[in-house]
Curated annotation (Swiss-Prot):
A GO cellular-component term linked to this record: chloroplast
Family the entry assigns: Belongs to the intron maturase 2 family. MatK subfamily.
Gene Ontology molecular function: RNA binding
Keyword vocabulary terms for this entry: Chloroplast, mRNA processing, Plastid, RNA-binding, tRNA processing
Protein name, as recorded: Maturase K
GO biological process: mRNA processing; RNA splicing; tRNA processing
Primary role: Usually encoded in the trnK tRNA gene intron. Probably assists in splicing its own and other chloroplast group II introns.
Gene: matK
Coiled-coil segments: none
């Protein structure tokens, strides 16, 4: 964020609401071409124009925009009177990239002020993805149902602009956004997977989608707080909203002023909500009747308030004891562990059956093999194949790449309850490495292994640094007795999901 303050010289109290003049600053496009707000934020570069993103073209773009008296035109007139001339595609993508950086400034300033005022702990251990699973072990095992709802996409671009106007108070910036959307996106297929991303700036696309999803989440969290005896705790930042309580009043009118009378049906202190990969996931201890009421509440909220057509079939309800939740690269489910206790009182003895609920985390082997298949490590059936694009590299680089991928997957999936699936992934990567090396040296796999020996690829199965540290602390018999290799280990240094794990 310090980069923004150096480049833009913003005054937090007065100037951050007027973002439109920043589109004429060269430093904005330099930040857009770099890494954005800070090094931790992911920036998606434009595939077709990365090599043309030069300072000369940026200056030419700013000069052309400054000379234009009418930047905003209707969608019908855009084809007849293009704003940017022959380089329409290039200039528009550059403007979209710059606007994607600009529109994040108010959020970043508020986030910094919130962190400074709340004195949020800056422990890196709390940022680990694995730190979520101990929480799930403690909470999810006591819940009964999980509700998964696919978030509907807006069918009209104006819905996106209307959702963003509560965050960005600069009307000129919104007009620029509206112009860009109508200029280069089809009204019916703007938010469709993998189509608009190649046309429009991916960073701006993700920002608009998150703004659209957060719009209904604020209302959901508000009603959830009103209907529960306990206050909800969020890991995010509740930012200031305009006309928020007016929206709640309007929502009550949509439900014919009877919604407040029915709030008692939703009283549930054991409820957890999260949004993940285009889905709203709600886990609850409610009965099947009450969880079905939440299902139709989601549908009504989307249809009557956001004017988005949705069907009840897009919302699925499953029992945690019979269903596995695909979350953060693990299949999580609640498993019953039966146990029998023998009790004796005087001369009478009897058996007590007791079942304890525990969280079972498994590797999604099918989806992970699908990711390996897309990356050309194996075929769709999981049979290892060679990696021809790496065959030109030195042998040490090829082995290092495969070993690094194998160790990263082993490190991330160390919390799996069953390690057999992980051994299968290691097998695929091991023989894919062998076939790649054999392809490079124009030999068969058998002849190549016979020439170099079986110890050639032992790095795939050597113990990790963590396992070596445990072996120094505990005696060797401890691992065999306790079956330590089957236990789950959650690490506190994993801050991102591997590309192969994040298959969707």
């Amino acid at each position: 964020m310090e980069q923004f303050q150096v480049y833009l010289e913003l005054n937090r109290s007065r100037r951050h609401d007027f973002l439109y003049p920043l589109i004429f600053r060269e430093s904005i496009y330099a930040l857009a071409h770099g890494h954005g707000l800070n090094k931790s934020m992911i920036f998606f570069e434009n595939q077709g124009y990365g090599n043309k993103f030069s300072s000369l073209i940026v200056k030419r773009l700013i000069l052309r925009m400054d000379q234009q008296k009418r930047l905003i035109s209707s969608a019908n007139d855009s084809n007849q009177n293009p704003v940017f001339g022959h380089n329409n595609n290039l200039y528009s993508q550059m403007v979209a990239a710059g606007f994607a950086v600009i529109v994040e400034i108010p959020f970043s300033l508020r986030l910094i002020s919130y962190s400074q005022g709340a004195e949020v702990a800056k422990s890196h251990n709390l940022q680990s993805i694995h730190s979520i699973f101990p929480f799930l072990e403690d909470k999810l095992s006591h819940l009964n149902y999980v509700l998964e709802a696919l978030i509907p996409h807006p069918i009209h671009l104006e819905i996106l602009v209307q959702a963003l106007r509560y965050w960005v108070k600069d009307a000129s910036s919104l007009h620029l956004l509206r112009f860009s959307l109508y200029e280069y996106c089809n009204l019916k297929s703007f938010i469709t997977p993998k189509k608009s991303i190649s046309i429009f700036n991916p960073r701006l696309f993700l920002f608009l989608y998150n703004s659209h999803a957060c719009e209904y989440e604020f209302i959901f969290l508000f009603l959830r707080n009103q209907s529960s005896h306990l206050r909800s705790t969020s890991s995010g930042v509740f930012l200031e909203r305009i006309f928020f309580y007016g929206k709640i009043k309007y929502l009550g009118e949509v439900f014919y002023n009877d919604f407040q009378n029915n709030l008692w049906l939703f009283k549930d202190p054991f409820i957890h909500f999260i949004r993940y990969q285009g889905k709203s996931i709600l886990a609850s201890k409610d009965t099947s009747l009450l969880i079905n009421k939440w299902k139709y509440y989601f549908v009504d909220l989307w249809q009557y308030y956001f004017y988005l057509w949705s069907q009840s079939g897009r919302v699925r309800i499953n029992q945690l004891s019979k269903y596995s939740l695909d979350f953060l690269g693990y299949l999580s489910s609640v498993r019953l562990n039966p146990s029998v206790v023998r009790s004796q009182m005087l001369e009478n003895s009897f058996l007590i059956d007791n079942a304890m609920k525990t969280l079972d985390t498994r590797i999604p082997i099918i989806s992970l093999i699908g990711s390996l298949s897309k990356a050309k490590f194996c075929n769709t059936l999981g049979h290892p194949i060679s990696k021809p694009t790496w065959a030109d590299s030195p042998d040490s680089d090829i082995i290092d790449r495969f070993v690094r991928i194998c160790r990263n997957l082993s490190h991330y999936h160390s919390g799996s309850s069953k390690k057999k699936s992980l051994y299968r992934i290691k097998y695929i990567l091991r023989f894919s490495c062998v076939k790649t090396l054999a392809r490079k040296h124009k030999s068969t796999v058998r002849a190549f292994l016979k020439k170099l020996g079986s110890e050639f690829l032992e790095e795939f199965f050597t113990e990790t640094e963590e396992e070596h540290a445990f072996s120094l602390i505990f005696p060797r018999g401890f691992f065999a007795l306790r079956k330590f290799d089957r236990g789950r280990i959650w690490y506190l240094d994993i801050i991102c999901i591997d590309a192969l794990v994040n298959h969707s």
